[in-house]
Swiss-Prot record:
GO MF assignments: linoleate 9S-lipoxygenase activity; metal ion binding
Regions annotated as coiled coil: none
Catalytic activity annotation: (9Z,12Z)-octadecadienoate + O2 = (9S)-hydroperoxy-(10E,12Z)-octadecadienoate
GO BP: fatty acid biosynthetic process; lipid oxidation; oxylipin biosynthetic process
Taxonomic path: Eukaryota, Viridiplantae, Streptophyta, Embryophyta, Tracheophyta
Cofactor: Fe cation
Keyword Mitochondrion annotated: no
Gene3D superfamilies: 3.10.450.60, Lipoxygenase-1, Domain 2, Lipoxygenase-1, Domain 3, Lipoxygenase-1, Domain 5, PLAT/LH2 domain
EC number in record: 1.13.11.58
PANTHER family named among the record's database cross-references: LIPOXYGENASE
Protein name, per record: Seed linoleate 9S-lipoxygenase-2
Subcellular location field: Cytoplasm
Amino acid sequence: MFPNVTGLLNKGHKIRGTVVLMRKNVLDFNTIVSIGGGNVHGVIDSGINIIGSTLDGLTAFLGRSVSLQLISATKSDANGKGKVGKDTFLEGVLASLPTLGAGESAFNIHFEWDHEMGIPGAFYIKNYMQVEFFLKSLTLEDVPNHGTIRFVCNSWVYNSKLYKSPRIFFANKSYLPSETPSPLVKYREEELQTLRGDGTGERKLHERIYDYDVYNDLGNPDHGEHLARPILGGSSTHPYPRRGRTGRYPTRKDPNSEKPATETYVPRDENFGHLKSSDFLAYGIKSVSQCVVPAFESAFDLNFTPNEFDSFQDVRNLFEGGIKLPLDVISTLSPLPVVKEIFRTDGEQVLKFTPPHVIRVSKSAWMTDEEFAREMLAGVNPCMIRGLQEFPPKSNLDPAEYGDHTSKISVDVLNLDGCTIDEALASGRLFILDYHDTFIPFLRRINETSAKAYATRTILFLKENGTLKPVAIELSLPHPDGDKSGFVSKVILPADEGVESTIWLLAKAYVVVNDSCYHQLMSHWLNTHAVIEPFVIATNRQLSVVHPINKLLAPHYRDTMMNINALARDSLINANGLIERSFLPSKYAVEMSSAVYKYWVFTDQALPNDLIKRNMAVKDSSSPYGLRLLIEDYPYAVDGLEIWTAIKTWVQDYVSLYYATDNDIKNDSELQHWWKEVVEKGHGDLKDKPWWPKLQTFDELVEVCTIIIWTASALHAAVNFGQYPYGGLILNRPTLSRRLLPEEGTAEYDEMVKSSQKAYLRTITPKFQTLIDLSVIEILSRHASDEVYLGQRENPHWTSDSKALQAFQKFGNKLAEIEAKLTNKNNDPSLYHRVGPVQLPYTLLHPSSKEGLTFRGIPNSISI
């Protein structure tokens, strides 16, 4: 609380302030490149275009263009609200400040203030210009009896006539609702109401309203029945997390579906509008959809390049020699810098991709069984392997609907290095990568398209030296007599010579196709992007910016998270979008993720709980973090537990500063409304599940916040930034399969005998879809130059609480220690899974990174 300052401030005192802002100096993506007839016009080299006609430099802010009014935190008016000071306008431009970042400008301002106004705790700002600007901060200096007061703003400010209520910002001090200075209470409540809106009307791009809706905008039925998609969310058939509401008009053919939009609404402060380079990465995805894919289609339509790879070297030529494209096709590629960097043409007709890490040392190590197994522990999808506790593996599919789906793998065929099946099970040495239940319900429909695939089960054995090896793969299909008749399957065993080795290589490819699709749609999109969005919405609607939990969680939401998800709905997961065009499930892709969401459990997103549930760890008080890993050399789990524990310790330290007892948590009205809304609205289709924490205790609050931070930072990093390093070689991570295993006596079988490479390439992702896939995942795998990583804050003055700042510094120091520790582990030759045959050290959970394609770094938020 502020001290009593009656009589301590002199009448007529002036408070000096500094306002830092950024001009709107970059055109929107749709202005940078206008799309017409598949071509791109208005190409600009830099991707940045200063709006000189709208803003005449910094002088536009002077005069009477922008005004501020201080609001007292200690003195109330007749209505019980903090007194409001006089309108004060920006003054001269400061030539330089040591703390200014790129593109930032600072202005002087002097406020008239006296003892009757008390101490400022908030301010109004009004923009009288026709163009918006990005307000970074206000700093008040030498406030009598108080010193410096800082306001961290980070918000777009539009012309004041566009707002129903004045724009208000609060000082960087945290208050629980019950501790808010009485003059600020109504301001706090009114700002939350503004952010909630009234749930009606179409949202305008300048608005800051957060609300919920179902995923009813993925299809485009007005353009054809083939583009209609089921609504996800709001039903037991297709449950889903909620997205941000836009209020767009319905389609003509389906009144429950929304029309696609040229530019999808997200609350304005969720989109930095290209002030951040991460936005250029994000809009690179849109560029791939609108510019790059049509360019590739043109090249293939002209038969300029065949749609098949004929050898593995053909695939590697994407990175080595490049592929030829017509000059007019090259010229239509997007002007965005990130796209130019990915598609290196050197002014010629040759298009090259960056060599992916997986083949930078060895061109063929990806083919080994050791690497195939290792990537289940240290690859881009390391959270799916499970410890096997019974044999044969059973199914959780409803037998009344699907019949018996117990695995048909026989014990007799497994090479367990002399162990019996009972010994292997009892000693925790059998593992499974099981996609059977996920794919079987959709496989009949998938295989009616041009795609052909299996539902796979892979059995693995932990050898005496601590490394993992595959011992059998089961390839399953729905029974030809109907779903209730069960399934048919082939069991493929390891082989290293003859046609059997080709069949084994193909079997591994079918497994990876399952894994690639599950990874992109479930491990990545659903389990990080989609499930976090309701938390973002609820936090902005129910937790004031001065609430300590808002300050804790905000950096793990900000930058571009909701904007990224909106772009995904627009270009990636939409009907005929990039995912449908290049991944096996095609039109059933997101529907499959809804089927998986039915079994999503919030508390299982805690890494220790996840490892225990997957039988990859057991509780053991004598082991680090109270868990003993069944595979000691499990890089994702080992590194992840270090990061998880550091996050949890930081959350405990921080939360303890504001909540002395469990009753403080129970009585926090904003916190309780927040959690109620997360459960009942944001994840409303699962609201009746018994596993939701009640949020009544300190431990529950710590666990909830730790899960949110872990999911938005480390988990997303683990499943995102390895996509191109591993998947940039389509041979290693194919995204679809086009034919089943050739049967003996067929022409395809004879081809397989003659050329294993051609048989493999005719089965997996063809060239056109490969180019789409690589274009997308190279962007997704990059870090922006202004990325903010775990243990960092964009503004060092994010809070005025010195104890919170000390705890955060402790967290940052711990992460630096962890990074050094993980580096040492990667240098230990006994930890084989950390590097593997491809000689790619596991660094995805190293907290820090440089810009670009680095295979490391944990950003604070889902920023790509």
